[in-house]
UniProtKB/Swiss-Prot annotation:
The gene is NS. A motif (Nuclear localization signal) lies at residues 34-38. Pfam families: Flu_NS1. One of its GO terms (biological process) is symbiont-mediated suppression of host PKR/eIFalpha signaling. The lineage of its organism: Viruses, Riboviria, Orthornavirae, Negarnaviricota, Polyploviricotina. Residues 180-215 are annotated as: CPSF4-binding. This is Non-structural protein 1.
């Protein structure tokens, strides 16, 4: 096994431990807690894949970080915060909507990259809205936390979520997964609306003037799958 893979896992375990202690002191906001839960699942999956114990890896990671901090204490940091692209978190859903349990009468499940698509094929003739919580960097969706499909009476009938044990997803993965979910829901004569915030950061492309426009194909798809404005 590559030594960098092991040390990377060890450092990730220790940093998650620090973040968990921060959250235990009631200082974490909703996006912070969302990422904490997601990363915990990811670490468990990596632990199983690599055959490494999380507790012992956390201790090893502590030693690595301690050594780095000691080295940094005698020298100026080589990077600056201004060189890091600004990332921010956007929410369509409340914590209650994200954590609410739901079940499917006729389950259908697909996978796009590291994203899992789940939908209830028993739902017919409904007005459905897609909502999502995700992070944005460079004005594009960076990481999807969770997307869910809601009926007008707030019932959950579908979702797209990352698979914790697999590597990260791309903006294109998210778009493809949304199109598959829409296609599955429309098959049963449902009308699907995509929230404005999700459209804005998932389907936008830069034009020559620095603005953002849907491509002709995407615009046709959105017009065909988004219900009328009220």
């Amino acid at each position: 096994m590559d030594s960098n893979t092991v040390s990377s896992f060890q450092v990730d375990c220790f940093l998650w431990h620090i973040r968990k202690r921060f959250a235990d002191q009631k200082m974490g906001d909703a996006p912070f807690l969302d990422r904490l839960r997601r990363d915990q699942k990811s670490l468990k999956g990596r632990s199983s894949t690599l055959g490494l114990d999380i507790e012992s890896s956390t201790l090893a990671g502590r030693q690595i970080v301690k050594r780095i901090l000691k080295e940094e204490s005698d020298s100026e940091p080589k990077g600056t915060i201004t060189s890091v692209p600004t990332s921010y978190y956007l929410t369509d859903m409340t914590l209650e909507e994200m954590s609410r349990a739901w079940f499917m009468l006729i389950p259908n499940q697909k996978r796009v990259g590291s994203l899992c698509i789940r939908m209830d094929q028993a739902i017919m003739d409904k007005e459905i809205t897609l909502k999502a919580n995700f992070s944005v960097v460079f004005n594009k969706l960076e990481t999807l936390t969770l997307l869910r499909a809601f009926t007008d009476d707030e019932a959950i009938i579908g979702e797209i979520l990352p698979i914790p044990s697999l590597p990260g997803h791309t903006n294109e993965d998210v778009k493809n997964a949304i199109e598959i979910l829409i296609g599955g829901l429309e098959w049963n004569n449902n009308t699907v609306r995509i929230s404005e915030i999700l459209q804005r950061f998932t389907w936008r492309n830069s034009n020559e003037n620095g603005g953002f426009l849907l491509s002709p194909k995407q615009k046709q798809k959105m017009e065909g799958t988004t219900g009328p404005e009220v």
